[in-house]
């Protein structure tokens, strides 16, 4: 405020409580902001606060990202935020060489449901059914490393990401694919397996993040 910055480092679950405690002592010309992964309730809070605001989400963390080279990592800036606030975070994220995208709150929640809940649920299932291996293969070890990293995250953060209203639809898609794959395996359907592998290989080839450039922040 008054060209000074005040920062608080808190867990996502305390974001709204922290804002409610400090707003009474902030000048009305302040821009309040968050970089929370979980934005449940933030849009309504901001709109009723009487303050200008900016909200963003760096889509990476210290568990898996290489913090010395973030050029392959992404950050989302919420489009409903204050213009000057968005410029501040755009400049900051450009300095870190992040790929910057501008989404609405709803688009952010949809992205989180897709890009976080699918790998989270898949990893949880792996961890739930795995057992000790004396001589694990490379793929198993890589999955284990991912599971250990993910499960080291805060319980509340994992819960809130999975409790996103859009997550059940993604989990239903996983369940459908598992059902289809199980039928192929149980029936020893070689032709079905060949078609399935062809389908998912083509899907991986077709997955491109360039389509997100339509939302990319102008630089």
Language-model-derived ranges and their functions:
Residues 102-208:
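An accessory alpha-helical subdomain
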Residues 5, 57, 108, 117-120, ...:
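Histidine-centered active-site/metal-ligand motif
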Residues 1-6, 10, 209-219:
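Single conserved hydrophobic/aromatic residue that forms the stacking wall/gate
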Residues 26-41:
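ADP-ribose/adenylate-binding Rossmann-like module
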Residues 4-7, 11-22:
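Rossmann-like NAD(P)-binding element
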Residues 24-27, 69-70:
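Short, conserved loop/helix-junction motifs that constitute active-site signature segments
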């Amino acid at each position: 405020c008054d060209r000074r910055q005040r920062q608080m480092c808190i867990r996502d679950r305390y974001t709204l409580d922290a804002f409610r405690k400090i707003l009474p002592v902030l000048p009305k010309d302040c821009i309040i902001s968050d970089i929370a992964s979980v934005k449940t309730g933030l849009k309504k809070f901001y709109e009723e606060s009487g303050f200008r605001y900016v909200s963003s989400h760096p889509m990476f963390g210290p568990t898996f990202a290489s913090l010395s080279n973030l050029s392959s990592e992404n950050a989302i800036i919420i489009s409903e935020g204050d213009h000057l606030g968005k410029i501040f975070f755009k400049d900051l994220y450009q300095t870190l060489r992040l790929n910057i995208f501008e989404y609405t709150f709803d688009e952010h929640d949809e992205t989180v449901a897709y890009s976080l809940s699918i790998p989270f649920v898949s990893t949880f299932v792996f961890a739930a059914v795995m057992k000790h291996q004396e001589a694990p293969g490379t793929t198993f070890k890589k999955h284990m490393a991912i599971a250990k990293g993910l499960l080291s995250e805060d319980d509340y953060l994992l819960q809130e990401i999975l409790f996103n209203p859009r997550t059940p639809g993604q989990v239903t898609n996983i369940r459908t694919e598992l059902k289809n794959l199980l039928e192929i395996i149980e029936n020893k359907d070689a032709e079905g397996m060949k078609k399935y592998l062809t389908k998912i290989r083509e899907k991986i080839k077709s997955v491109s993040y360039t389509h997100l450039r339509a939302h990319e922040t102008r630089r």
